[in-house]
Amino acid sequence: MTFELQHTDTASDARTGIITTDHGQIRTPIFMPVGTVGSVKGVHFSELRQQVQAQIILGNTYHLYLRPGLEVLRKAGGLHGFNTWDRPILTDSGGFQVFSLTGIRKLREEGCEFRSHIDGSKHIFTPENVMDTQRIIGADIMMALDECPPGQSDYEYARKSLGMTQRWLDRCIRRFNETEPLYGHSQSLFPIVQGCTFKDLRREAAKFVADKGADGNAIGGLAVGEPKEAMYEMIEVINEILPKDRPRYLMGVGTPQNILEAIERGVDMFDCVMPTRNGRNAMLFTYEGTMNMRNKKWEMDFTPIDPDGCEIDRIHSKAYLHHLFKAQELLAMQIASIHNLAFYLRLVTDARQHIEQGDFVTWKRSVIEKLGERR
């Protein structure tokens, strides 16, 4: 994997670039649809390519490890062979999912013991077997195993947790370097910066990660309950230290406003389940604000869902989508999910264009307030 930094905004830390993988190029800033179990909920890959114009998707190591399992994935030739997605894939380490399973996991130096949410069977994730698992999945970009402490953790816990994450990172790197890709395409490993909302811990973590010289770096443990101002402050602290010639990935973020604020602060890559989750619940993101398609106000509105959006937005009316949600038709959730994903991709594409034009900050200010309105 390589990263070419193309343009840096003169009025902010926003930048554009190109990530090149063996499965294709990714133009940054980029939003990555979440395909937890190897599929993006309710959206076929043909629609991801043509309507959404997704350049890369995510898979989840925890879920794929449990089902379909490593034997199936290895025999299929990895996730690319299994689901036939022919563009880049990033997998998270599964750590966030394991640590969110409070009451059914046990953390220790070796790794994290947990019980399957499917059948209750016992498992352990270690830095070594998480690297092995992601080799079998075959993602273009692999994530290191880390502990993601709760957003309101006290300093002592955050300090201990960061130490564990750093020791695990060293073990991940060692195992990654000891093993080879299985399917003929290269793979890259991204470390993750943790440290809650403590500036000194975030600085220490960013320096530790930067010294590893990885192909790219991730920022974890944000958007987990802390005020958004604290999240933006942590991004600034971290990006002062992370190398400028490597892509920066903000994990699990977020709203359109969050994404624009993070782009302004030098972040390149984003993922979040919000576009599809909110879409399934009749909430549509637009430049004019968020629309609840169950509201009666749309019943007689025969204008396009979004006249500037993807083809599906242009051919279907708000009234039709309102009807589908009232009738509880599955197509409603599909259309809304496609719209939201396409909007997120359009948002980062527009951001890229304005960074290159030199007016990103002015453009961001002109759109960000409306993005948060309810219609």
What are these regions (language model features)?
Residues Q152-Y155, R159, G216-L222, L330-M333:
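Glycine- and acidic
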